[in-house]
């Protein structure tokens, strides 16, 4: 099996319950909800996507795990890896999960939730999109871009998740969207406001 990886880097997690935690990010190329091409954005399920995930480098299993290990500080413990995209579950398979675990990584995944998990993942963050049925029945984190046409946070009242986050939709209306998300959280305390702190920190 080979994997197409758009980028692989060491950073601090900028969102959610693992905010500030050092992590190796593996961003897989490709998504099932948008091609990533601007000319196709109007037809995308999530037209608001702000992530570049087209193209990348091919890795074999051993090479990808070795690249992740090489990024981790020498001699440091608590290895943490975030698999993201695009949609990582289009490529992530059981052998990769097993190999990352064998290398000592706690493995987290950021997914739109439309694809099943191929094996044990230590931390699952699901970010549902309007019109995209979920294949996952639970998550550690539920992260919803807000406001999002065609989807209401109340729809996920019964969805099992340890943490529920509202992420203000980025773009020209960010200030207003942040105010709207904050107001919703104040009225529905089961939701927490999620801000992309890595952008404020000036890191990837």
PLM regions and their residue ranges:
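Conserved AdoMet/S-adenosylmethionine-binding subsite of the radical SAM
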Residues: 77-79, 89-204
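Conserved Radical SAM active-site core
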Residues: 3-6, 10, 22, 33-121
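A short catalytic or substrate-binding loop motif that flags glycine-/basic-rich loops and adjacent residues
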Residues: 17-19
